[in-house]
Amino acid sequence: MANTALADTRSELEAGARALGLPLEGVQLDRLLAYQVLLAKWNRVYNLTAIRDAGDMLTHHLLDSLAAVPRIAELVRRVQPEASRVLDVGSGGGLPGIPLAIACPDIGVTMVDIVQKKTAFLTQCRAELGLTNAQSHWGHVEKLADAVGYGVITSRAFAELNDFVRLAGHLLAPGGRMVAMKGVRPDAEIARLPEGWAVESIERLTVPGLPAERHLVILAPSA
């Protein structure tokens, strides 16, 4: 990015994050912008996202992911106050996992994807951005095992809700929540949820600069 464009993008990012209740420090803003540059660079070769315009990346990727961060952070810190852990399923180019890891350095973020080139990108992001609280895993989430479990398991563009809970639900810590990021309210998907799962809440998100519907669907095991 040219210096003027970079300054404008930084100002827009800072204002957007503040509107979302995320007063980020300078180093966090720098890391988010560096992540966007990495995403655009790798995208030219590996096709990580269909969005290529820098302005659209800011709203559709960075701010869209950051909009979910306050709620995800609140939930996981409540469930795991000592060592908060979030699993991002089908993370792709690191959304929402990388923005979450940058905004919340106290939260451990694991990102899983079945496409090796995407997890290679996530590994590169961890190294270049110095994200010691983030890690990536290449493979199928249903084959993962974890003795502790994750306080929050999230996904942004992974699958329908029934597949989300079926494939990843075994990794949830006691008292944990599954948080799906969706566009329009997914009533049809909710109706297809399998037995043993219940919708705790459906929360509408407002993303600065993005005039589109966004919802968080928060799921919990039912008694």
Swiss-Prot record:
It is found in: Cytoplasm. It comes from Ralstonia nicotianae (strain ATCC BAA-1114 / GMI1000) (Ralstonia solanacearum). Coiled coil: none annotated. S-adenosyl-L-methionine binds at residues 90, 95, 141-142, 156. One of its GO terms (molecular function) is rRNA (guanine-N7-)-methyltransferase activity. The gene is rsmG. This is Ribosomal RNA small subunit methyltransferase G. Specifically methylates the N7 position of guanine in position 527 of 16S rRNA. It is an enzyme of class 2 (transferase). It catalyses: guanosine(527) in 16S rRNA + S-adenosyl-L-methionine = N(7)-methylguanosine(527) in 16S rRNA + S-adenosyl-L-homocysteine. Belongs to the methyltransferase superfamily. RNA methyltransferase RsmG family.
